Amino acid sequence: MKIVFMGTPDFAVPCLKALVENGHEIPAVFTQPDRPKGRGYKMIPPSVKKCAEEYSIPVFQPLSLRKGEDAEKSMTALREISPELIIVVAYGQILPKEVLELPKYGCINIHASLLPEYRGAAPIQRCILDGK
């Protein structure tokens, strides 16, 4: 199956690896742009980008999928790829309706906790703090 993967942190890497290792065609990975980190503000690529590069999968890093030149380029690429499915794991952006309607079989979002109760940047920690 032709699957576009969208994810960013370490949490998303096992899902990407499982898709590749189980023979799915992954024509593209979308992830957040590299960000400066540490004292020297060295640009660090997201974990998903590093994983995709290990498998020689093309990587897209748009600032936004909703507006601007990045969004237009990303939509053009997605239309050309024509994915059967998009899998989203901790991507860090809300997908516009146009992206959600593009794949033949739709989109699947994998989240680290119950939604909508534990949405946001620290869902696992919030579950633990609530004793769940």
Regions found by a protein language model. Give the residues of each.
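One-carbon transfer enzymes
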Residues: M1-K132
